[in-house]
């Protein structure tokens, strides 16, 4: 049997996020990164869960669609939507928007929907899950919020706080089944999906 038949499918992360890339490196598997070109605008009437799942699948399918015919690949798509009081919270983009987000969330519980999709190009099958993390924010004064934003500039993350960095100081508690979900890529769920399709994550199974 040839090496090509024994070789596992390519693993591709469909994301431009350096945080997701760093998380995937923890699994110690070779992977490529491809940036999906999709419209990430939420649709009218969508729940946060539906938005996150739709975008995670769209990212994976967009990258898979650009692969050559016959390429065996497992494409990982992920998306995160934060919400409180029924309002969706996106990436702030600017300092002013980030400050407004943190002011609105202080003293509140915020839910982060971290959706994950694994698209198998060999069969066209999709595994998808939404991992919910409940985060209680501390009730901090504006001066503390400003100091945090100037220190970490978290303008590219939903909710304006990097829990893997200084942003942890803004939080009172985190409740989740997957400690990596809040950063943006639920590794417990991803490991389960990879093992389910026979990927040799822990060696030959």
UniProtKB/Swiss-Prot annotation:
Q: Pfam family of this protein, just one?
A: Maf
> One GO molecular-function annotation for this sequence?
nucleoside triphosphate diphosphatase activity
Q: What is its EC number?
A: 3.6.1.-
Fetch the InterPro entries from UniProt: ITPase-like_fam, Maf-like
Q: Which GO terms describe its biological process?
A: nucleotide metabolic process
Q: Which catalytic reaction applies to this protein? A: N(7)-methyl-GTP + H2O = N(7)-methyl-GMP + diphosphate + H(+)
- Residues of the site described as Important for substrate specificity: 19, 80, 164
Keywords assigned by UniProt? Answer: Cytoplasm, Hydrolase, Nucleotide metabolism
Taken from the UniProt entry, a GO cellular component term is: cytoplasm
Indicate where this protein resides in the cell. Answer: Cytoplasm
- Hydrolase recorded as keyword: yes
Main location, first listed in the record: cytoplasm
Q: Which residues form the active site?
A: 79 (proton acceptor)
Names of the cofactor(s)? a divalent metal cation
Keyword check for Electron transport: no
Annotated function: Nucleoside triphosphate pyrophosphatase that hydrolyzes 7-methyl-GTP (m(7)GTP). May have a dual role in cell division arrest and in preventing the incorporation of modified nucleotides into cellular nucleic acids.
The entry's family comment says: Belongs to the Maf family. YceF subfamily.
- What NCBIfam families does the record point to? maf (TIGR00172)
Q: What name has this protein been given in UniProt?
A: 7-methyl-GTP pyrophosphatase
* Native source species: Paraburkholderia xenovorans (strain LB400)
Q: What is the lineage of its organism?
A: Bacteria, Pseudomonadati, Pseudomonadota, Betaproteobacteria, Burkholderiales
